[in-house]
Structure formats: structure tokens, C-alpha cells
């Protein structure tokens, strides 16, 4: 344990953390009512080694470490890919240089993503990949001589990241960015997309879009699953409709598949549920199997060509760590591991286990909905979940959960067998029962 923590005791880690470290959506220091983070010292397979009451415990990583570790932790093939690449080249600038890991990953992504996505831009995170997607759309229209097409349209209830432009297309009311409303770009928001298919919704969506066509650069949506905006699911037929609508009105379509890509919904990409191709698509999170931060933005050759011959003469974006060889190499390994197994059966088995296990939450006081899509299970409550209660309750059952707002959910690694899925759902039901 000392090696894993660089010689610091858990108490020392906690003290330094409290004094100096920001966490996602956190305060600094020991604020009243805020529970301190749990110290993690190791991760193997689907299990995390955490320090609780001064002692190590094992807990299932029901979150796949925020939806990334689809193969679990410490996978031998991914470890080997990373080690081999580290021995050859850890990093080189991507300006003026290229390398095999980037080329292999680009070709792999072009081969497996929806048809027509032929060019790849690598970035450091999902938020940045969305930012790049929007810049692609804006530069495309400038190159086409239509600079007025600069606004975006999306469904309410979405989440696309924490940088400024992605923030502007997150849900404006129930999202996490209302603090910045006065400085964010004014986008066009359609009503929340329903779970069940209703052609009238798509008709109303088209009517609203048509009112803004001269100023719309793109429609940006999360296909099938709206993630951090509320873990809501919708019928894939809406994707077919929005694809047709965008084509009719000469508006680009961007799919944000950062949370849904690489099998999470039961298809390799959520777009595959209805067989449509967007003009631009963002992937991330599970891309590297949870090892390093990497995302990609793919677009059609038509868009890439228009940008390249436009006034700027280039796509105006270039991250320092773009196409990092370590991240690209481990991503190739992760995707090949996924494709080399019967991942559909694994996700289907997890889906069945989540459905069966979460049935016990139906009818609990305070529970208003239970839903499953692929390897995603959600219990929606009628009030916010208290992490000070939920976290220890889940750890009592040796499960790491991270509820947010009124949602208790899980997106487990694909390696979890039925017994571990049952353990996860038992903890979820326990936590939901404490909310009511």
C-alpha cells in the first residue's frame, strides 16, 4: 500500500486533499456538511481498494470510474500495450509529426463508427471534443459563405461538458451551469425528448428548427441516453427523425457519444440503434478503457474539405497533448479487446441482471422511476440523494456508487459476472430505500 500511495498514509493523503485539492463540483477544505473523499489505494478487475475507518476494503466499481473502465482495472492486454509504447515513445508534439498509435487508432475509429465519418481529431477530454465539434461546424459554414449560421440547437435535459461552449448546450434550467447563464451563448432549446416515440414531438421539433434555420449551424444531441443531465433514455427513432430534419433544412447534426460509445447501450455506438450517421461525432470516456484521458471528434470528408479550403486554411484548434502516443496505443488495445469478445452478450447479460435486480426498487417510497438501457441502470427518486448517507450504505455492501442529484445509478464494467451485478443492484436498492 505504501508504494501505491508514494509513502503517504491515508491520513496524510486526506489532510493534503482537504487543504489543497479541488474535486469535481466541490468545495475546498472541510466545509460544513461535506463528507471527505474516500482514499483509493489500488484497483484490480472490477474492484477498488479503498480505505474505510483506517482499514482497506474491497468495493465493486459500479461506476466504471465515471463510465470509462469498461474492461475493469489492470487489464493485462491494456497494461502490455501501455508498457510497450512507454518503452518506445511517451509523447511527441503532433504539430508536424505523426506516429503509428495515432494512425492505427484513427483507422480503427473510421472503420467502426457510423458510415461517412472519415476524419479524426484527437483531443484531451470529452468537453474539448464537443468544443472541437462546434468549431468544425462554425468553420464549415464560414467556408460555405454563411457566417450567420452560428447558433446551436439541442434537446433540454442534455449535458455536453464543462467548458464554455459545451456548457451553453447543457440543460439551461435543471443542468449544472445556471450560474453562467448571463455569459453563455444563447442557443435554441427544444423541449425534453420523450422516452416513448411520438411523431408529434418530431414534427414540433422541425417546426421550431425551421424558425431558426438561417442562424443554425448544428443540432447537437446525445443519442439514446442523455447522461449527466439526468440519465434519461429515448426511443432511437427520434435519431432517424432528427437526421432527416437536419438534412431537409441544411443544418449539421452532431452526436455526442462520449458516454454511450463502445457498447454501453447494447450497440457499439448509440447511433447504430437506428442506423443513422451524423455529420460530426464525439467519442471519449471508454475510448482508452479508463487508462488515460483521450477523446476524438470525427467528421465527414465534405466538412473536412470545406474547412481546409476556407479562409483560415486550417481547423483552428491544436491541443498540446493531441494524439498522445500512450493514450492512442492503449485505446487501440481497448477497442481491440472489446471487438475481440462477445461484448453484445456481455452487455445483454448485464442489462438483464440490472433489470432483475432493480425490480425490488419499484414501489419503494420516494422512487418515481426505475429504468435500464444496455449496461446502464437507474433509480430515480423524488428528492436529492444525500451522499453522506448513500456512500456509507453502499460501502457496507462493498459497492462504490456515486449518486447525483436524485439519481442512484450504475454503469458497471463489462467484466462483472451476474453475482457482482446482483451485489451492485442490491446496494442501489438499499440506497434508494434510504431516500424515501
Curated annotation (Swiss-Prot):
> Primary place of residence?
cytoplasm
Keyword tRNA-binding tagged: no
N6-(pyridoxal phosphate)lysine PTM positions: 285
Compartment list: Cytoplasm
Q: Where does pyridoxal 5'-phosphate bind?
A: 126-127, 256, 319-320
Q: Name the CDD domains on file.
A: OAT_like
Q: Which UniProt keywords apply?
A: Aminotransferase, Biotin biosynthesis, Cytoplasm, Pyridoxal phosphate, S-adenosyl-L-methionine, Transferase
**Which is a GO BP term held by this UniProt record?**
biotin biosynthetic process
A single MF term (Gene Ontology): pyridoxal phosphate binding
HAMAP family reported for this sequence: BioA (MF_00834)
Q: What does the subunit comment say?
A: Homodimer.
Protein family according to the UniProt entry: Belongs to the class-III pyridoxal-phosphate-dependent aminotransferase family. BioA subfamily.
Tell me what this protein is called.
Answer: Adenosylmethionine-8-amino-7-oxononanoate aminotransferase
Organism listed in the record: Mycobacterium leprae (strain TN)
